[in-house]
Amino acid sequence: VTARDLNGPARNELKTLSKDNAEQVARHLAMAARLIDDDPALAHEHALAASRSAGRIAVVRETVAVTAYTIGDFALALRELRTYRRISGKDDQIALMVDSERGVGRPDRALEVGRAVDRSTLPVDVRVELAIAMSGARLDLGETDRALQELDIPELDPDRAFSWSPALFAARAAVLEELGRDEEAAQWQHRADVAAAAIGEQDADSETMEIDEIDEIELDDDAEEDLAPDASAETATADSAPDGDADRA
């Protein structure tokens, strides 16, 4: 792994460091990104190593927060997310903050954190992630009807698939199941599966895909019929959607 394996925007944040230090920190961050799915604990160790050498860099604190969240250290994730927010001035990890408050057993506080943000200023994908996290906090409080209301957002379009659609559809399915509306829950879970398969097909056809690219795919009737519980979606028409930035519920 070399410093070049780290994405460009993150490398740019390291320019205030000495050349040798920037190289070392970049390698740790690149390793954290590479390992987070397969070995989150080791990814977290690399993030902590980067933090020891570059604790005032926003992307470093963000990486510590994300890896801490992944291993279930929600208290550390919260501290690091607050620091990241203060350094960067960004709210793009607000959904993770809400979920981390849930993780430490404070769903009421999670709702306060989510409500304090002007959602109209957020990128679309972040807005969707926040809605999912807020819905989860409502479930934690036993407010199932209000959990469903949190997901009633303009982005909930059953006929089109964006990059955020599978998670949003699946979240709605889970809440409907909690409400005992099993038939509706199954329909939304099916839509989630169709959307995920369609997006997966498009990704497979693309040589490269920017991490912050938002893709829109029309979900036609044939695609939904083709995706039986044991089959794969075969038909989807890909279109471009509005730009957005990439952030978990």
Regions found by a protein language model. Give the residues of each.
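Alpha-helical segment of the N-proximal tetratricopeptide repeat
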Residues: 16-45, 49-52, 63
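Structural register within alpha-helical repeat arrays
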Residues: 31, 63-64, 97, 134, ...
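Structural motif corresponding to the intra-repeat A-B loop/turn of tetratricopeptide repeats
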Residues: 36-38, 71, 104, 141, ...
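Intrinsically disordered, low-complexity mixed-charge segments
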Residues: 177-235
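TPR/TPR-like (Sel1-like) alpha-helical repeat modules
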Residues: 87-90, 119-120, 144-157, 169-170, ...
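Generic helix N-cap/helix-start motif at coil->alpha-helix transitions
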Residues: 21-27, 43, 54-61, 88-96, ...
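Solenoid-like repeat scaffolds
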Residues: 14-20, 48-55, 82-89, 116-124, ...
